[in-house]
């Protein structure tokens, strides 16, 4: 059955809110999941929402009824084109024809209801049946929050009353005020007769309470539990592998309470013998802690791993000695793994229950699927439960879908389970065989966590092997998501995305491919057989995390991957003298931060396919479109676009002191903030090898736009290859790069021009590179020979300040034979600059672009920024109309070279049409474009900066939005609200009357440095960064306090309700104070630097200053709203670092 036939459009009406909703669900969706999806979309929360049910009104002579929550949509055939349901509070459905409303009202007084509860308590079956026959509705709560059915289920051997209640209209799944059903109550109290009666009357063994626990789990919570209750629940196909908020399974609780027979039943019906909780403790560890030698003996006899270690590196034997339980230690020491006898038979289930699509035959996989040799692992259930995530802040996590490879049996999936997956699942689900999965996008995304090597900037000597077939793998899979239904399992390696080979791609590239997918995504994955996997050099067994505690995850070691902390464009280059030093992986805390609050994986698609693009994005796009065609000329260094757009950065610091320490270790020369940065490292083609990694795809490189990570001012870009090594296709592709994780911006107005001509002969390589670094200077006709002789020993001269002209003029650079020219050649290189003397001013650009006072020196210092004196000397040319701009471009081209070809003119004209004036607003998206050469005054100096008195504003760059077009989050489940995003943003202003100055200087470093995810790309650049001098030519550095930083707002307000300037000031001030003297604003700024701005309202309302912050403990942080352990640990760790 195809996807369209499986989809059902439901029309659901909510009478309490007078709301009508339309939901598209599949035939295999459980009623419980449909109800939860509906409750999440309601504008107002309903009280006791767990007691609301989907009601099917009477139709075609059939009485209305509430749909059972443990069944699927397929079990309820609908006759209408658009099935109609109602979400109503569960009440008795009367089938009597002669109803007297007055009599019913008299039956439901407080006195009558109290009397009815007394009859239930006294087991007076006749009275209960009589009152129900008179029309009393048994679906109500007493003063203690109990229902008549839950009260009756708690009384031993109360079969008659239970039958009378359910026969009298009581819903079997009606919950008490704590969200527990009668089945939960009977299982907890080990009332075997009551559990049996409820099951016979149609109750499900898989009801969930608000935290997702089942009756089977409840049965393991007491030491005097009856094993017959567990057995009958398991025979009715109860879910196994349900965990609480601490990650404890049923078998953990059974071992804790010494329930030996329960452990036997759980193992026989497929329980995971070596399941781990959040601390990494297996059931054997629990036996060691609680001194349960009998349970430990059963576990070892059935194949438990006695060498399994927890997250503290302790085995069960270690734990038993530490706690002081010699009984368990003796059992473990005396155990011989060869004597283990695991269960190998298939369990028998009850034939009375209809095992249809409602309850899948999840134990169809043979129970002989046990791990090889002395490590035995019982197989997991293939069945996906209907309610793996409960509507509570502490959702349950089910691990029963993890499949362990085996040498004894072949893993098989039942046909019904394959139907429920909804995707193309390979028959048999064998290991080491690639399979194709088609995963539809659900409400929470696709439902997986991707993990692997990040930011591959250099070519990898990685060849896929049988053990490590790809760089990216799936760390976790949402047990209630679409991926697990399609057959995806934790630990699977990703081979292809929509037919594109991604085995050697970095994490960012793969994320972009996933984000570009539509409503469905086709993945080619493979499950690696753990038993055949080598434990040596190429595989690392990563410790289990909260999202994949029960799956073996293997990762390529750093030795197999080059250092990949800097993003490349299309090419990836490798220097022969460089060594690989490691690779970055997504840590669990980074994954949680990146995906907000949720623990299930998803890659969200930004709403709206045709979203507007911000000015900063256009600026960076135009900068990247400046692809050099001159042989040997370097690429211009790209702007920190991801930081400007407020995109998430994967590099985090544990504390402010850690940030400062690590920044100090990487203290390299910084390029002038906001200026067009160029690299001066010249690598000869003979000493470097450039490799290009282009994935095969059916269309030319248009869809692939590599993401860029933030470049710190102190990082150096690896030298890009000469243009002679770059094919025209690659050059075109490099102009299409982007830096967002969101839906890619696909420009439709891209000028359709032929590729640039092949470069001329390799001559004057050094001079060409110098001219490309200064595109505003026309090419000299001849270059003095001593320049090339001195290049090896004398540093190249510093670049001049960029011409701050307002018109988007284009400078044409061409290779021409040496001839006489009136344009003066560039001056010879300057001698080395001493530490105390400033360098001489650089050569001026041609006249007409800008005017610099001859007396204004270019200051240099040890900090970053632009000096005020340098800014005073800048005189800007006034803006000209668009026609004048186009004419000037044409005139310049004609003056430079008369032999310009037609396609070059077309290219320049097309590019000129895409650019607008800096200080004029024109129509919406087409006209909101900016300079392409990195010389825009939005990045350096605004127009008419001499009148800075009315332009400079002390506005911080923190908490600024980019008109809502910031980078998407690379989340499990990212937050939908843009208003709650407190991460730094940067935007550009197009107002024609505002004159401002932007210095992306030390403040940017302080703010975005905490999110720095870049490091030196190779060993050579790392070594050079430690010896470079801050007075190196080509870098303008002045104290950051000369001119206060401002930013350009697209939005008048950040939307947070707080003053951005106050937050900025607080971030500056708290770093120079002791914690004891911190004010409330200092604490708020400190929290913002830790990316924990969501707690600032509570800290501000409680007036938490530095002294109070030092006295905060766990309970105090909880009162302030810091309930997440990871966030509290970040705060405490950072605070300890400051105090030390």
Curated annotation (Swiss-Prot):
Keyword tags: ANK repeat, Cell projection, Cytoplasmic vesicle, Repeat, Synapse
Superkingdom of source: Eukaryota
ANK repeat start and end residues: 144-174, 178-207, 211-242, 246-275, 279-309, 312-341
Biased composition (Pro residues): 794-806, 823-847
Region described as Disordered: 337-412, 640-673, 687-856, 875-902, 961-993, 1008-1028
Domain PDZ: 436-529
Main location: other
Tissue specificity statement from the Swiss-Prot or TrEMBL entry: Expressed in the pharynx, pharyngeal-intestinal valve, intestine, rectal epithelial cells, tail neurons, nerve cord and sperm.
Low complexity biased stretches: 388-412, 761-775, 784-793, 1015-1028
Molecular function per GO: ionotropic glutamate receptor binding; synaptic receptor adaptor activity
Cellular compartments annotated: Cell projection, Pseudopodium; Cytoplasmic vesicle; Postsynaptic density
Classification via InterPro entries: Ankyrin_rpt, Ankyrin_rpt-contain_sf, PDZ, PDZ_sf, SAM, SAM/pointed_sf, SHANK
Database matches in Gene3D superfamilies: 2.30.42.10, Ankyrin repeat-containing domain, Phosphatidylinositol 3-kinase Catalytic Subunit, Chain A, domain 1, Transcription Factor, Ets-1
PANTHER family to which the protein is assigned, alphabetical: LD13733P, SH3 AND MULTIPLE ANKYRIN REPEAT DOMAINS PROTEIN
Homology family: Belongs to the SHANK family.
Subunit note: Interacts (via PDZ domain) with egl-19 (via C-terminus).
Note: In contrast to the mammalian Shank proteins, does not contain a SH3 domain.
The protein's name: Protein shank
Annotated organism of origin: Caenorhabditis elegans
Gene for this chain: shn-1
């Amino acid at each position: 059955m195809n996807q369209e036939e499986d989809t059902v459009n439901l029309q659901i009406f909510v009478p309490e809110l007078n709301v009508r909703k339309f939901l598209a669900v599949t035939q295999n969706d459980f009623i419980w999941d449909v109800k939860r999806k509906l409750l999440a979309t309601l504008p107002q929360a309903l009280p006791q929402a767990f007691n609301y049910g989907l009601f099917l009104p009477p139709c075609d002579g059939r009485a209305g009824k509430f749909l059972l929550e443990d069944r699927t949509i397929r079990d309820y055939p609908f006759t209408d084109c658009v099935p109609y349901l109602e979400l109503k509070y569960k009440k008795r459905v009367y089938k009597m024809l002669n109803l007297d409303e007055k009599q019913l009202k008299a039956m439901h007084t407080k006195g009558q209801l109290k009397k009815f509860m007394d009859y239930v308590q006294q087991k007076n079956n006749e009275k209960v049946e009589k009152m129900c026959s008179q029309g009393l509705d048994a679906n109500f709560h007493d003063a203690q929050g109990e229902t008549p059915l839950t009260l009756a289920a708690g009384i031993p051997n109360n079969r008659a009353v239970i039958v009378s209640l359910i026969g009298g209209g009581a819903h079997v799944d009606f919950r008490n005020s704590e969200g527990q059903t009668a089945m939960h109550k009977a299982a907890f109290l080990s009332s075997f007769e009551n559990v049996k009666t409820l099951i016979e009357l149609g109750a499900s063994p898989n009801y969930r309470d608000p935290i997702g626990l089942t009756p089977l789990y409840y049965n393991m919570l007491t030491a005097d539990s009856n094993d017959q209750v567990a057995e009958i629940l398991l025979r009715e196909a109860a879910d196994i592998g349900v965990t609480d908020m601490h990650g404890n399974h049923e078998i953990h609780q059974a071992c804790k309470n010494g329930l030996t027979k329960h452990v036997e039943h759980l193992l026989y019906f497929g329980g995971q013998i070596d399941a781990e909780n959040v601390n990494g403790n297996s059931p054997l560890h629990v036996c060691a802690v609680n001194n349960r030698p009998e349970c430990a003996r059963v576990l070892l006899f059935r194949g438990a791993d006695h060498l399994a270690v927890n997250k503290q590196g302790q085995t069960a034997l270690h734990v038993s000695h530490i706690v002081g339980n010699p009984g368990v230690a003796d059992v473990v020491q005396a155990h011989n793994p060869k004597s283990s006898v695991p269960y190998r038979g298939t369990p028998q289930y009850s034939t009375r229950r209809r095992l249809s699509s409602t309850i899948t035959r999840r134990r169809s996989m043979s129970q002989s699927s046990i791990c090889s040799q002395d490590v035995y692992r019982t197989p997991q259930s293939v069945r996906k439960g209907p309610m793996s995530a409960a509507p509570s802040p502490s959702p349950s996590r089910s691990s029963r879908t993890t499949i362990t490879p085996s040498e004894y049996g072949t893993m098989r999936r039942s046909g019904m389970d394959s139907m429920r997956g909804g995707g193309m699942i390979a028959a048999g689900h064998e290991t080491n065989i690639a399979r194709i999965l088609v995963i539809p996008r659900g409400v929470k995304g696709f439902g997986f966590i991707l993990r692997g090597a990040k930011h591959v900037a250099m070519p990898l000597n990685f060849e896929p092997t049988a053990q490590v077939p790809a760089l990216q793998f799936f760390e976790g899979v949402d047990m209630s998501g679409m991926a697990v239904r399609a057959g995806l399992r934790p630990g699977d390696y990703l081979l292809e995305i929509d037919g594109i080979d991604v085995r050697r791609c970095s994490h960012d590239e793969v994320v972009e491919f996933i984000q570009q997918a539509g409503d469905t995504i086709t993945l080619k994955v493979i499950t690696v057989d753990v038993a055949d996997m080598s434990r040596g050099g190429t595989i690392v067994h990563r410790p289990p995390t909260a999202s994949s505690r029960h799956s073996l995850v293997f990762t390529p070691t750093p030795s197999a991957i080059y250092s990949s902390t800097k993003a490349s464009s299309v090419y990836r280059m490798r220097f022969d003298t460089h060594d690989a030093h490691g690779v970055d992986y997504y840590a669990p805390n980074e994954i949680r931060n990146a995906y907000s609050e949720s623990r299930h994986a998803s890659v969200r698609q930004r709403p709206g396919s045709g979203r507007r693009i911000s000015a900063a994005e256009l600026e960076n796009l135009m900068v990247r479109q400046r692809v050099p065609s001159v042989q040997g000329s370097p690429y211009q260094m790209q702007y920190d676009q991801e930081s400007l757009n407020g995109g998430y950065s994967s590099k985090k610091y544990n504390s402010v002191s850690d940030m400062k320490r690590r920044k100090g270790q990487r203290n390299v020369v910084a390029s002038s903030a906001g200026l067009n940065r160029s690299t001066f490292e010249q690598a000869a083609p003979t000493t470097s090898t450039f490799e290009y990694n282009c994935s095969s795809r059916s269309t030319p490189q248009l869809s692939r736009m590599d993401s860029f990570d933030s470049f710190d001012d102190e990082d150096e870009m690896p030298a890009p290859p000469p243009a002679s090594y770059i094919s025209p296709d690659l050059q075109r592709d490099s102009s299409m790069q982007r830096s967002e994780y969101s839906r890619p911006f696909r420009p439709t107005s891209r000028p359709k021009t032929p590729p640039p001509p092949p470069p001329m002969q390799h001559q004057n390589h050094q001079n060409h590179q110098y001219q490309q670094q200064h595109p505003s200077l026309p090419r000299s006709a001849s270059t003095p020979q001593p320049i090339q002789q001195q290049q090896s020993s004398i540093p190249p001269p510093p670049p001049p300040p960029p011409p701050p002209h307002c018109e988007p003029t284009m400078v044409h650079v061409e290779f021409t034979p040496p001839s006489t020219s009136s344009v003066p050649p560039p001056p010879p290189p300057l001698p080395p600059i001493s530490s105390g003397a400033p360098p001489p001013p650089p050569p001026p650009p041609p006249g007409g672009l800008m005017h610099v006072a001859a007396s204004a020196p270019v200051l240099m210092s040890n900090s970053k920024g632009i000096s005020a004196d340098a800014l005073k000397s800048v005189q800007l040319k006034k803006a000209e109309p668009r026609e004048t701009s186009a004419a000037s471009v044409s005139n310049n081209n004609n003056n430079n070279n008369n032999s310009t070809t037609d396609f070059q003119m077309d290219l320049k004209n097309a590019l000129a049409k895409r650019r607008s004036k800096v200080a004029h607003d024109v129509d919406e998206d087409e006209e909101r474009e900016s300079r392409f050469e990195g010389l825009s005054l939005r990045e350096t100096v605004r127009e008419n900066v001499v009148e800075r008195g009315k332009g400079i504003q002390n506005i911080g760059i923190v908490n600024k939005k980019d008109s809502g077009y910031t980078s998407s989050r690379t989340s499990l489940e990212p937050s939908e609200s843009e208003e709650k995003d407190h991460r730094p943003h940067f935007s550009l202003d197009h107002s024609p009357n505002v004159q401002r100055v932007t210095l992306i200087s030390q403040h940017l470093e302080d703010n975005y440095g905490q999110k720095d995810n870049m490091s030196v790309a190779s060993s050579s650049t790392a070594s050079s960064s430690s010896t470079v001098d801050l007075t190196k030519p080509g870098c303008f550095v002045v104290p950051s306090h000369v001119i206060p930083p401002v930013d350009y707002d697209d939005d008048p307000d950040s939307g947070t309700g707080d003053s951005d300037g106050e937050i900025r000031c607080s971030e500056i001030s708290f770093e120079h104070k002791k914690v004891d003297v911190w004010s409330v604003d200092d604490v708020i700024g400190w929290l913002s630097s830790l990316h924990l701005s969501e707690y600032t309202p509570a800290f501000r309302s409680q007036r938490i200053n530095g002294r109070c912050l030092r006295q905060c403990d766990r309970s105090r942080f909880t009162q302030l709203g810091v309930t997440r352990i990871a966030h509290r640990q970040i705060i405490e760790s950072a605070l300890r670092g400051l105090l030390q």
